[in-house]
Design a protein with these regions (language model features):
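Short, well-formed alpha-helical segments that are part of the catalytic scaffolds
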Residues: 1-23
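Short aromatic/hydrophobic "clamp" motif used to bind/position activated sugar donors
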Residues: 71
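Residue at a conserved register position within TPR or TPR-like alpha-solenoid repeats
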Residues: 196, 233, 267, 310, ...
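Alpha-helical repeat scaffolds
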Residues: 207-211, 241-249, 277-282, 316-325, ...
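Catalytic-site signature of metal-activated, phosphate-bearing donor transferases
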Residues: 57-63, 80-204
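Acidic helix N-cap motif at the loop->helix transition within catalytic regions
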Residues: 8-11, 33-42, 83-84
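Conserved donor nucleotide-binding strand/loop of the catalytic core
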Residues: 37-57, 61, 65
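A conserved acidic beta->alpha catalytic loop
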Residues: 16, 28-37, 51, 75
Length: 618
């Protein structure tokens, strides 16, 4: 091991290898914390090495100190899986073994990659490269033999918190630039691209990944290179280029789950919904497999993407079914928990139904489980926040309990708690504004009015809403800030079942321009108030029949609610106004549903001729 200031991780690492290795060798490069004190509890084989900005030099120094027949290399932020059996792995007596490294990511995610970490103690095996150091196993002079071990190494160094703490990205960039300058081979240029990708500098990443491609040939990292190149292009919204690469790559590597998953994400981001759905389903068939695979690409992540896709199509029941599968497979995945409550709310299920279903699939067995749950519910301002705080008798900050009371409709208790605070936290100012509207409380409004930085016109809008002025001016001009706040409040009022206040708020939004009116209709559709939305959309459509967003939204509402004759008219008009892929796919789905197979085939042929990256129409 090579260490420096690793007191937070080192004990876990060393405890994981007890009784599994014969000796522990630690190379310290200048620790100033309690690292060496902890290490001394496990071994006396501690050596100092002056750091020279070269991981290979430090690694080679460390393996020179080993006396055993085989060497296992770990970092301080890694630890062996409890079921690992190193002796079983080396029974075949090969020169080196590729072990799976499971890298923990933030929010409960993970990805797995293979690396040579177990190898024979031979003077001919040595490390190369300053940063992404690796053994010289590809060496025609020695003809080393290798295989795959079953040992799993867990790595925690890629969580957001750890990356920020260690400032790894900056360190990696400086070391890699020096390495690439001296030795611009496939491996180094590939890792340079990866490092820029981690730093979010996608254009630079693409330059190096493209340089690495012709040098890589049959290198084991070629599938990962292609995935990362396509991903970076996608991040820059160069979807055509990204799909060209990933679609060709899938032909060469048809069983690589990670590649399929990236392909599905790109299809989804491009708006190729049918291909996205089929690709994520293919990922589920495969499961997690491949040399480098993000955990869940063939499982919970694919289900999560399907849940997003079905939600986007307003197929809320299918979205809910998919998100349930996410939580069943990975309860620690925080975005899945958040999405569950968002989707369940749109199903118009009662709070008790939402709670019972959740507890059926989410086992609350640890303190961390309830902490994660409370964080999600607070972020959503969900009515169940107060339920779980009370059920588990959790002590939380006063602003959290005030929010919990407010969104469980205990308005007067919430007001008392807000008024007891000397300062309203910035994150809760809109909560207090909403409560002031609900309770028609101008005094409470005054607590946050100044801090919200409203101008006089904006202040007047909220005063009108609090006072429920029925004859408010019809020429009110809403700023973007006010529009966004009111749209957000409209969802909250529906969830709280404050329909009279929702109506007052809607009256103000309907005095604005078309954009907030359309957004209001989208909110109504999301919460299944379809007929109300249609009643608002029709006069909008009559006044602005060529508004593409309006035609699309009204067409989708009619299609999803089986008003198919109206859908035919609207989707064909949409095709005239915006003859792009999304319009064509909508028309195809409509013709299939009404049984007009001839028209459906014509649309399919048109898609095939124009959109070469679309797979379902080929």
């Amino acid at each position: 091991m090579i260490v420096k200031n690793e007191e937070g991780d080192i004990r876990r690492c060393l405890e994981s290898v007890l009784r599994k290795v014969d000796e522990i060798i630690v190379i310290d490069t200048g620790s100033t914390d309690n690292t060496l004190k902890i290490v001394s509890e496990f071994t006396s084989n501690i050596y100092n090495f002056k750091w020279i900005g070269d991981f290979s030099a430090a690694r080679n120094y460390s393996i020179q100190k080993a006396t055993g027949d085989y060497i296992l290399v770990l970092d301080a932020d890694e630890f062996l899986d409890v079921d690992s059996d190193l002796q079983a792995d080396i029974e075949s007596e090969l020169d080196y073994y590729l072990l799976n490294i499971k890298n923990a990511l933030s929010y409960g995610g993970a990805f797995t990659h293979g690396a040579v970490r177990l190898f024979t103690n031979s003077r001919n095996l040595k490390y190369e490269n300053r940063l992404h150091e690796h053994l010289n196993i590809i060496n025609e002079q020695y003809n080393f033999t290798g295989g795959e071990g079953k040992t799993i190494i867990h790595h925690t160094g890629y969580t957001n918190e750890t990356m920020n703490q260690k400032d790894k990205i900056k360190r990696n960039l400086s070391l890699m630039l020096k390495e690439v300058e001296e030795n611009p081979n496939a491996y180094n240029t590939f890792n340079m691209g990866k490092t820029y990708m981690l730093a979010g500098e996608y254009e630079k990443a693409i330059i190096y990944l493209k340089k690495a491609y012709p040098l890589s040939g049959n290198q084991v990292f070629m599938p990962e290179l292609l995935c990362k190149l396509a991903y970076c292009l996608g991040q820059l919204q160069k979807y055509g280029d990204a799909l060209n690469i990933i679609n060709d790559a899938v032909i060469i590597y048809p069983n690589d789950t990670e590649m399929r998953y990236i392909q599905g994400v790109l299809f989804m981001d491009t708006g190729y919904n049918k291909d996205a759905e089929e690709t994520f389903k293919k990922c589920l068939e495969f499961g997690d497999r491949g040399m480098t695979v993000t955990e869940g690409s063939g499982g919970y992540l694919a289900y999560y993407r399907l849940a997003e896709l079905y939600e986007k199509q307003n197929n809320i029941q299918k979205s809910f079914d998919a998100i349930v599968e996410v939580i069943k497979r990975k309860k620690e995945y925080v975005p899945g928990i958040k999405k569950y409550f968002e989707i369940a709310t749109k199903l118009n299920a009662s709070v008790i139904e939402v709670q019972n279903k959740f507890e059926h699939i989410y086992d609350i067995s640890r303190i961390n489980d309830i902490q994660v749950l409370l964080d999600v519910l607070y972020g959503l301002r969900h009515p169940l926040l107060e339920t779980y705080i009370s059920k588990y008798k959790i002590n939380v900050q006063s602003n959290v309990i005030a929010s919990a009371k407010q969104y469980s409709r205990q308005y007067y208790e919430a007001r008392m708690l807000w008024n007891s605070m000397d300062i309203i936290p910035e994150e809760n100012r809109l909560d207090v504004l909403l409560l002031a509207i609900i309770l028609r409380d101008n005094v409470l409004y005054a607590r946050v009015r100044t801090e919200l930085n409203f101008n006089q016109r904006e202040q007047k809008v909220f005063s009108q809403l609090i006072d429920r002025e029925e004859k408010a001016p019809t020429d009110t001009v809403l700023t973007t800030l006010v529009e966004n706040i009111l749209i957000g409040f409209s969802s909250s009022l529906i969830i709280l079942q404050e329909y009279d206040i929702f109506q007052s708020l809607s009256d103000i939004l309907l005095r604005g321009n078309d954009k907030p009116k359309i957004k209001l209709c989208e909110v109504l559709i999301n919460y299944n108030f379809v007929e109300v939305a249609i009643d608002l959309l029709i006069p909008l459509y009559n006044s602005k029949p060529n508004n593409i967003k309006l035609v699309e939204l009204l067409g989708d509402v009619c299609f999803n609610n089986n008003y198919l004759d109206e859908s035919v008219l609207l989707y064909n008009k949409l095709l005239d106004l915006s003859p792009d892929y999304n319009s064509l796919e909508r028309c195809y789905n409509l013709y299939k549903r009404i049984g007009d197979l001839h028209s459906a085939q014509q649309i399919k042929d048109k898609i095939h001729n124009i959109y070469k990256n679309v797979k379902w129409a080929s």
